[in-house]
UniProtKB/Swiss-Prot annotation:
Signal peptide: none annotated. The chain crosses the membrane at residues 34-54, 61-81, 108-128, 141-161, 170-190, 212-232, 263-283, 305-325, 361-381, 383-403, 422-442. NCBIfam families: nramp, Nramp_1, PRK00701.1. Belongs to the NRAMP family. It is a multi-pass membrane protein. PANTHER family: NATURAL RESISTANCE-ASSOCIATED MACROPHAGE PROTEIN 2, SOLUTE CARRIER PROTEIN FAMILY 11 MEMBER. Keywords: Cell membrane, Ion transport, Membrane, Symport, Transmembrane, Transmembrane helix, Transport. The gene is mntH. It is found in: Cell membrane. GO terms for cellular component: plasma membrane. H(+)-stimulated, divalent metal cation uptake system. GO terms for molecular function: cadmium ion transmembrane transporter activity; manganese ion transmembrane transporter activity; metal ion binding; symporter activity. This is Divalent metal cation transporter MntH. Its main location: membrane. It comes from Staphylococcus aureus (strain Mu3 / ATCC 700698).
C-alpha cells in the first residue's frame, strides 16, 4: 500500500450524519462515554442477525455446549477487528470503502465494490428472509408480501433520520435489548445445566477432530465476522464532533468508541451464547437433526414436551418476535452499510432516498424472485441463506486485508497505527479466517451436491 494521503476533496462518509452528535473532550469521562454510546449498537446487530441464529441453535442442538468456546474466540476476534475500524475512521476521516478506493485504480476498485455489494446483499437477504418468516409466523402474512413490506423499512429509516442519528441508535438499542431479554427468559425457562454450560467455554479437541462439529464451528466463525460491519463502523464513529485536526481529541474519541464497541459486542456474545444454550438445553440428544430452519425451530419450541402447551406457545411466539426485531435491526444497518459502500467506492452523488431504495431493492429482489420460482416454498427460501453465507465468506478477505494494510501504515494513521502485537494477531486471524472460509465454501458446495 502506498503512502498517498487522504485527498481534501473526498466526500465525507455518510455526510448527513458526519460530525453531528456532540462530543466535548473537556467533559467528564462519564459524559464522554455517553456521547460515544451508540455506534457499537449498530455494529453488534450484525453479530446477532437472523443469519447467525440457525448456526448457533443447530450447534447447541447437535453438539450440546461444546461450541461455546468457538463463540467466545469469534467474539474476541471481532472486538479486535472492530477496534481497528474505529481507529481507521477516526484517525483518517475515511471509512473503509473510501480508503480502499483511495489506494486502488478505478477498475480494481469496481471489482472490490462488486464484492462488497454482494456481501451486503447476502447479509440483507438473511434479514429480509428472517423478517418475512417472522411476519408469516406471527400474522400469517404470505412470505412474498412480508418480503415486500421490508422495502418500507427504507422510508421509515429516512423518516427517522430527519430527527437525528441518535434516534436510529435508540431504536436499534431497543430492538437489541428486546432480543436479549426474550432469550434470557427462554433460557431461564429451559433450565440448562450450569456446569455443562461453563464447561463449554473450555476448548475441546473434538472441535477439530469431529468433522460435523468443525463444520458448524466454521459456520459460527464465518457468520460472526461480517464484512458490512467493518465498512459500517468505520463510518458511523465519525458522527461525533471531535476535532478532526487534534490528535488528543482523536485519541479520546478512539478510546470511548472502542469501549462502546466492546460493550455492545459483549451483548452480542451473550445473545449468541443464549441461542446455543437454548438449542442445547431443549433439543440436544432428541430431535436435533430436524432443526433445519426458522420454521423448524418455531414449531419445535411450540411442541417441546418439557415446556408444555402454554409455555411452548409463549416461547415460540417470543422467538418470532425476537426474529422480527433482529431482522428489522439488521435491515437498518444493512441499508446504511450499502450506502457507505456505494458512496465510498463509486463516489456517487444521488439523493439519499434513491440510494437507500436501490440498496434495499438489490436485497429484496433475489428473495422475491426465489419466492416466485419456488412458489413460496419456505425450505427453498431458507436454503438461500446457505448461499448468502458463502458470499460472506468469499468477501471477507477483500475487506480484512485492506483494513490491516491501512491501519498498519504509519503515514496514513499517524500515532494511531497498529502496534506490533496487533499486527501479529490480526494477520494470524486474517490467514486463519481465510483458510477456514475457503474450507467452509468447499464443504457447503459438497453438502449441497450430496
Amino acid at each position: 500500500m502506498n503512502n498517498k494521503r487522504h485527498s481534501t476533496n473526498e466526500q465525507l462518509s455518510l455526510d448527513e450524519i458526519n460530525n453531528t452528535i456532540k462530543f466535548d473532550h473537556r467533559s467528564s469521562n462519564k459524559q464522554k462515554f455517553l456521547s460515544f454510546l451508540g455506534p457499537g449498537l449498530l455494529v453488534a446487530v450484525g453479530y446477532m442477525d437472523p443469519g447467525n441464529w440457525i448456526t448457533s441453535m443447530q450447534g447447541g442442538a447437535q453438539y450440546g455446549y461444546t461450541l461455546l468456546f468457538v463463540i467466545l474466540i469469534s467474539s474476541l476476534s471481532a472486538m479486535l477487528l472492530q477496534s481497528m475500524t474505529v481507529r481507521l475512521g477516526i484517525a483518517t476521516g475515511m471509512d473503509l470503502a473510501q480508503m480502499t478506493r483511495h489506494y486502488l485504480s478505478r477498475p480494481i476498485a469496481i471489482i472490490f465494490w462488486i464484492i462488497a455489494e454482494l456481501a451486503i446483499i447476502a447479509t440483507d437477504i438473511a434479514e429480509v428472509i428472517g423478517s418475512a418468516i417472522a411476519l408469516n409466523l406471527l400474522f400469517n402474512i404470505p412470505l412474498i408480501v412480508g418480503a415486500l413490506i421490508t422495502v418500507l423499512d427504507v422510508f421509515l429509516l429516512l423518516f427517522i433520520m430527519k430527527y437525528g442519528f441518535r434516534k436510529i441508535e435508540a431504536i436499534v438499542g431497543t430492538f437489541i435489548f428486546t432480543v436479549l431479554f426474550i432469550f434470557i427468559f427462554e433460557v431461564y425457562i429451559s433450565s440448562p445445566q450450569l456446569n455443562a454450560v461453563l464447561n463449554g467455554f473450555i476448548p475441546h479437541s473434538e472441535i477439530i477432530t469431529n468433522n460435523g462439529i468443525l463444520y458448524i464451528a466454521l459456520g459460527i466463525i464465518g457468520a460472526t465476522i461480517m464484512p458490512h460491519n467493518l465498512y459500517l463502523h468505520s463510518s458511523i464513529v465519525q458522527s461525533r464532533t471531535y476535532s478532526r485536526h487534534n490528535n488528543e481529541e482523536k485519541a479520546q474519541a478512539i478510546k470511548f468508541a472502542t469501549i462502546d464497541s466492546n460493550i455492545q459486542l459483549s451483548i452480542a456474545f451473550v445473545v449468541n451464547c443464549l441461542l446455543l444454550v437454548l438449542g442445547a438445553s431443549l433439543f440436544f440428544n432428541s430431535n436435533a437433526d430436524d432443526l433445519g430452519g426458522f420454521y423448524d425451530l418455531y414449531h419445535a419450541l411450540k411442541t417441546e414436551p418439557v415446556l408444555g402447551a402454554t409455555m411452548g406457545a409463549i416461547m415460540s411466539t417470543l422467538f418470532a418476535v425476537a426474529l422480527l426485531a433482529s431482522g428489522q435491526n439488521s435491515t437498518i444497518t444493512g441499508t446504511l452499510a450499502g450506502q457507505i459502500v456505494m458512496e465510498g467506492f463509486l463516489r456517487l452523488h444521488i439523493p439519499n432516498w434513491l440510494r437507500r431504495l436501490i440498496t434495499r431493492s438489490l436485497a429484496v429482489i433475489p428473495v422475491i424472485v426465489c419466492l416466485i420460482i419456488f412458489k413460496g416454498n419456505a425450505a427453498k427460501i431458507e436454503q438461500l441463506l446457505v448461499f448468502s453465507q458463502v458470499f460472506l465468506s468469499i468477501a471477507l478477505p477483500f475487506c480484512l486485508i485492506p483494513l490491516q494494510l491501512a491501519t498498519s501504515n504509519k503515514d496514513l494513521m499517524g500515532p494511531f497505527y497498529n502496534k506490533t502485537w496487533v499486527n501479529i494477531i490480526s494477520w494470524t486471524l486474517i490467514i486463519i479466517l481465510s483458510i477456514l472460509n475457503v474450507y467452509l465454501i468447499v464443504q457447503t458446495f459438497q453438502e449441497l451436491q450430496s
